Amino acid sequence: MKNLIRKFSDIHLTDLPQVGGKNASLGEMFSELSAQGVRVPDGFATTALAFWEFLDTNRLRQPLIELMNQLDKNQFTNLGAIGEKARKLILDAHLPDNLAHSIIKGYRELDGMTDQFAVAVRSSATAEDLPQASFAGQHESYLNIRGTEQLLIAVRKCYASLYTDRAIKYREDNGFAHDRIALSVGVQKMVRSDLACSGVGFTLEPESGFRDIVHLSGVWGLGENIVQGTVTPDEFFVFKPTLRKNKKAIIQKKLGEKEKTMVYSPDAHSKSAVVNTSSPPDKRVQFVLGDDEIEQLARWALIIEAHYGKPMDIEWAKDGESGELFIVQARPETVHSQRNPYRITSYKINKKGITLATGQAIGNKVATGVARLLPSPKEADKLKPGEIVVTSITSPDWDPVLKKAAAIVTDKGGRTSHASIVARELGVPAVVGCGNALQNIRDGETITVSCCEGKTGYIYRGKLEVQQLDYDFSDLQKPEHTKAMLIVGDPDQAFKLSFYPNDGVGLMRMEFIITHFIQAHPMALIKFDRLKDDKTKAQIEALTHHYPKKELYFVDKLAQGIATIAAAFYPKDVIVRMSDFKTNEYANLLGGKAFEPAEENPMLGFRGASRYYHERYQQAFKLECEAIKSVRNEMGLTNVKVMIPFCRTVEEGRKVIDAMKANGLDRDLDPGLEIYVMAEIPSNVLLAEAFAGLFDGFSIGSNDLTQLALGIDRDSAIVSSLFNEQNDAVKQLIGMAIRKAHHAGAKIGLCGQAPSDFPEFAQFLVQQGIDSISFNPDALVKGIENIKKAEERTILSV
């Protein structure tokens, strides 16, 4: 028996040749990590020896070799027929008596109470789930198998799945000899996730490869809906360093629609063992996991990653009967762990065209090609290499087809769907979950698939002009004396940008989060009942329906956005500027018009620090402070600093500091908290010593400082030609600000485009002794080059 089946408690990674990657990993976790609290369902596995004995007893080795020799290895025109014949040979065969008896004995020992308890029966090939052989899903698994008769049938079906079309093609593509691959079958106690939830996890951020995140996603019911991409799952981002410190480590939660719930078919005679049902409305607006459960899974993920010594791809499930969480599979992550994250290619579309469809962007590339609408993988011969697959949804059966595609577009699916996983592995762009791509895209027309514009992917009509920039940051040295920092606004770009050479974030714009993630005016949330427009109220209700108070929605979303950026650059400084909309910009937020005055010149009106203590906005400023307090104190991201914009007078600075104290941001109670002020008004420069008595540092805002020094309205096209940061008056103010700040013992930096565009301006700043310069990401490399040259010249001139 021992040679034909092995209990999980007796299996380790070293047994991979006998039980395959999947079962070796399950056994390793069960035997080695259970003592650390990682819960893995018990089970056993048939061995490779059992598989060979099955083939030999039925004299199948030679017939299978002969079948594979008949395969058309150029065009694969007879792949379907060959695969079907091979599977029939195995399904028509019988299990040797000693193997069948061993399986039945192992099954009964798992429970001991009944012969009808449910198990999962999973295939595990001896070359599956290895980093160099990464396509999972080549072989079949069978869930909710009850009784010895059904179990033995499922084992034969697993054996037959070694010859699915996709498995045969995969072995051909990877140079594996068909007659050298054995199949082990894992038999594992079922987790009743059909009564609860299930999902997947990565011990890195799956889009960028950022290593300090545990990314979890989950759906109601069985996890197949995530793999198939038929529903939009909940997503959770957990930050490893603060998790280890027992802080509130969930930095971001995204509520998915979870439209369907997959459960076991109530009809025992149904052709399908599972059925998809519509999720109840109340379940769709509820997260599948509580915060404690999210952190428990994340801690297990850390234990698993530490044990294996590499990033891991994990499957989890919650038992609806016991309420317990389980890890049901773990394999090495195979995409980002194989890449150098410091080699980055960025794309920019110079002129956008007509948008045909949008969805979730997978990757950051752009591809142009002929659209080929394919209802199923059986029409693979229609696709020519370099064309773009447009379909409803993909599954592992699509793998041979997708390898020829320049890009993938699907109407269904999410970031963890099959199409997304394959796109990452193949390194091609994909736009998933479009909803209307098949309707709007014509078969045979040329399209451009763009994933370079953030989380949203676009499909444009025609061939667009694309600019490609290749960076290798592996050996790029930062300046020696002047910090090179980034300007960041979009949390969705933060993890990718963390691989750029940087000394932190010199300006985090809060406005992007409010506009794109929150969308509503904070006062409209606080005084929702005052709103008279029914359409606006309905839109706000749709955004906030799963929060008990609408103000909590603002605080939570803002805190998550800030925390994501702070985590991406942790422990480097992330200087968060409090909201700096102008009144016309605030008015454009949902409900904003009811709370904003109409101003002739908003650029010089009710903006910046003046709002924070004013009765029109002070309640909203409290929400901003609560978000900062949550990020620093509860989440433990103490690298977050605060910056006050457009502070006109020293007295106004005192009022803002007092307002922050009243709202819980008190430097006496939190000595690590630093508060900076923008130096963008001449009064900030002329009275820099007095401002330095209130604030911990300055950041020169060259745009507003130029506007106010030269009396130029930045929004006026007529006088825009006079706008010049290098005007002597502006440079004198900048030089004065740097000298006065340093004299007062305060740090000072500058945010803006000019140091990257004009080497002589960078030279001026370095000569003045500025502490840091912050750049937009696309200007960072040029900016670093200019700073380094300026530092070299400054040293030579001394």
Set out the residue ranges of the language-model regions.
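Extended active-site and interfacial segments that coordinate phosphate-rich ligands
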Residues: 136-169, 193-269, 328-360, 404-411, ...
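Conserved catalytic alpha/beta cores of large enzymes that bind or transform nucleotide phosphates
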Residues: 213-313, 318, 357-365, 391, ...
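N-terminal beta-alpha lobe that positions the nucleotide/phosphoryl donor
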Residues: 1-186, 195, 284-292, 300, ...
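Conserved metal-phosphate-binding beta-hairpin within the catalytic cores
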Residues: 137, 309-334
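Conserved alpha/beta-domain cores
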Residues: 115-118, 125-135, 140, 180-184, ...
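Acidic, glycine-rich flexible loop/linker segments
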Residues: 321, 335-337, 357-360, 365-388, ...
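Long, charged amphipathic helices and adjacent flexible linkers at domain junctions
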Residues: 68, 79-82, 103, 175-176, ...
